Every structure is written in C-alpha cells, then in structure tokens.
Swiss-Prot record:
The entry's keywords: Carbohydrate metabolism, Hydrolase
Annotated InterPro entries: Glc/Gal-6P_isomerase (IPR006148), Glucosamine6P_isomerase (IPR004547), Glucosamine6P_isomerase_CS (IPR018321), NagB/RpiA_transferase-like (IPR037171)
Record gene name: nagB
Active-site residues, as the UniProt record annotates them: 67 (proton acceptor), 136 (for ring-opening step), 138 (proton acceptor), 143 (for ring-opening step)
Name used for this protein in its record: Glucosamine-6-phosphate deaminase
Organism (species): Halalkalibacterium halodurans (strain ATCC BAA-125 / DSM 18197 / FERM 7344 / JCM 9153 / C-125) (Bacillus halodurans)
Described purpose of this protein according to its UniProt entry: Catalyzes the reversible isomerization-deamination of glucosamine 6-phosphate (GlcN6P) to form fructose 6-phosphate (Fru6P) and ammonium ion.
Amino acid sequence: MKIIEAKHFDDMSLKAAQFMIEKIQRDPTITLGLATGGTPQKMYELLINDHRTNGTSYHQVTTFNLDEYIGLDRHDPNSYYTYMHKALFDHIDIRDEQAFLPNGTASNFNAECERYEALIQQRGGIDLQVLGIGANGHIGFNEPGTSFESSTHIVKLTDSTREANARYFNDLSEVPTEAITMGIQSIMNAKEILLLASGKKKADALYQLIHGKVDESFPASVLQRHEQVTIIADREALQKVAVSSN
C-alpha cells in the first residue's frame, strides 16, 4: 500500500489527475473503474483540462462506474449517469458505448446486477479502480457488514449515507433508499486501486483503513489484502497516519 500525501484538496486532485493521466497514456485501452461524489470532482476537471490542452485521448478507454441509484431515470439531474456526463464524459472523447453504469430503472434489478458483473468480466476486468471512502469505511455503497465476497448487488442505503448525499437533492425525502453497487469482491478484482480522501472528517477512516483490523464491519479494511493500492490524501485526512517521505 503506497501513501501519497497532498497539501490540500486541490493538490490531492492534481496528484490524482497526474496519476490517472500517466496510466491512460501508458495504456490507451485501459479499463477504468470510476467513482462519483465530491472527492473526485476536481480530478475530473483536471482530466478535462489535460484532454483539451495536451490531447490525452479516451477514445479507446472503457469505464465502469461503481454504482447508481435505484429509481432515478438516467437523465435525472441526481443520477450518477448525469453526474458522470456533466463531470467528465461530455467533455472528453470517450465513446458512449464504452462508458458503463448500472441501470437504476431496470425491470429486473437482480438480473441487472448479474448483467453488470458479467459485463465487467467480458471486458477483461478493471485495470484501475478509483475509490473514495466513507466515514464509516464504506466503499462504493458497500456499507459496514457487507460480505467481502459480494459481487454487484442491490443495497439499502443507510440513513447516514442518505443524509451525506442529501446536499445534492432538494430534500432528504428525495434521496433514493436503494442503489446498485459493485460488490467488495468486484472492487478487489481490479488489478490496481486508487483511493482518494480529503479533509479531517476522513482522518479516522483512513487510520482504520491502514492500521485497523481487516473486518467486514469496516469495508475499506479489505484493501489491506490488495497487492496494488495507492492512497492519495491530503494532510487533514492523513493527520492520524504517519507518512514516510514520498
């Protein structure tokens, strides 16, 4: 597990973007696992700037997103489909047919979970998975207690997760109660993982991720078992972790 310390959120975003760009330039056909939310948003802006300025191409890149809300049409302003298109896809040269998200309005959600998991395998698996981390250790929408052996599945969102995401909605009542998420085993199947964290609210979670017991009560702890994990986090998030010079 490699830890890279950033000065602050913008520096974390820059280091993450540079990390991603290097991977894409080295392998133009890379398959990326992508995350949503506030943590990677600035990184996506920097990827767009690099694409426009330096011409880094996504034409042969394939992407799979971690999750999607159940019950939101993909064109709903708060769907992760819309988030990804506004934050990244609409501004780079990725092909629509190469950018995958779970279908939150599928007629059969169990079948959709199986389809999505199979699709990842058919495409050769994920080369680099981007993750954030929740204060309770969740990765994707995999909340505490999720089996480490889980594949893509339906999850009931906890009150704390819904409250954390309510800022994107008009009211807490509008936040969906369920989502489709890649499972913990799905995430662990990625060849390489990049985890981003920023702010003092993530300090306890990062400490537990790095130094805590590997246990399903703290989903991110499973990353200790992965051979290729890079953490890029700012000083506030790393305040409880001793970081050697990088």
